[in-house]
Amino acid sequence: MRKYGIIGKPLEHSYSARYFTDKFIREGVDAEYRLYERDDLSDIAVLMQALHGFNVTYPYKQSIMPYLHAIDDVAQAIGAVNVVCQGKGYNTDWIGFKESITPHLLDTDKRVLILGTGGVSKAVQYALQQMGMTFTLVSRYPNAHAIGYDNITEQVIQSHSVVVNCTPLGMLPDIYSLPPIPYEYITDRHLLYDCVYNPERTAFLQEGEAKGARIVNGKDMLYLQADAAYEIWKN
């Protein structure tokens, strides 16, 4: 029996075990998938030996990279890993994001406001670059590459018709938290996309919905990146 899993913290919100267990059953694969919630990566070498492959989630998508034997070129370019197979790191988050947001985009959607600068954000940035879209980064720690939340003015909101939450804010169990942006400037011309998928309607998306915006959660992104991860493990 091949063993798979997901490493991160927290994992109580994760759908991955259910998703992959069902997939293994449907495809007649002799495998199991478990959750490996960890406070750090001190036993990552042991896990890499024990598991044929695994997913990596918050907060380890970047910090796991030095432990890997090899890294795929795309994951290296992104600067984050969410899939490991036999010690090699890959990134399928960008595929999941690109394929899940594309059906919801209008011709007028050209500029994207990305909330957060972590591992998921890096995959989103890469996907948008492949799609030919421009973006502005927002960080709790503004720098030469990212503005701060205090810098999000009405003009910034109006000039970015797509807002993507790449932070864990609003994720179970902290369902009432949300990124501190001026939601009063969101209109029905906007698309709010949340990479969080549990709960399905986060506080961030509820604010957008109340303003008439299109809203999309991260559930399709999860499944699409998982399908791409499965293909890596299978092949």
Short names for language-model regions:
Residues 2-104:
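Phosphate/diphosphate ligand-binding glycine-rich loop within oxidoreductases
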Residues 53-63, 120, 168-171, 198:
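Short glycine-rich anion-binding loops that position phosphate/pyrophosphate groups of nucleotides
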Residues 10, 141, 198:
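Residues in the short beta-alpha loop(s) of Rossmann-like NAD(P)-binding domains
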